[in-house]
Each structure stands twice: as structure tokens, then as C-alpha cells.
Amino acid sequence: MRVYLIDGLRLNDYNKLENYLDKHLESSPLGGIYWLKLDQEILTDIQKEHNDCHSHVFALMLEETSLSSEFLVRITKKIQCDCMACATKEQRIWLMEQVDAIFEKLDIHI
């Protein structure tokens, strides 16, 4: 699986990210995982058709020294569905831009 990985976080960076993600994103029952909801405009046709599966998300995994996300569009309501898929190029770029914007907002420079 391809991933977007930012490593080399300092403890202060980790704390800022954890506070921000706790405040702005839904968290998974598994600690350190947050759901970043995709914009409707970048969903694939099948993802748009699957209203029962919304929201489509990327899973951000925060660890003490890194933040990562698989390039996999997931759903939170079911274990598996045809609308779960590897991210398109547009979705991958969107994810990286969203994460980079969070780092910029929090003044984290890696």
C-alpha cells in the first residue's frame, strides 16, 4: 500500500497535531487514528452513488514521531464495500494538500 508519511516530528509537534486533530476531526475507536472526510467534489462516481456508505475518509495515523495516511479511501460505516478503493491521483493530491495545510496552520516545519 502506498502511503503519505511525514516523520521526524518533535514532541511539541506531536502535541500540537494531537490537539488540533482531537478538536477538528472525528477519531477512530483505535487510539491515534483520525478520519479526514473527503470533499464530495473529488469522490469517484461509485463513491458518490453509495449514499449509505458516506462519509468517505482517509485514515490519518498520528504517532509520536510521525503522521501517515495510506492512499486508501475508506468508509466508517462498513467493513468492506466496492466504494472503498485506492485513492485517485486527485484524491492523493487533495490529501497531501490538506495535511500540508494543517502543518502550515500549526507552524510545524519538517
Model feature map: region roles:
Residues M1-L17:
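Terminal, regulation- and interaction-focused segments at domain boundaries
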Residues L11-N12, Q40-L43, E64-L67:
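Short, charged/polar surface micro-motifs in flexible loops or helix N-caps
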Residues D22-V57:
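Ser/Thr-rich, low-complexity intrinsically disordered terminal regions
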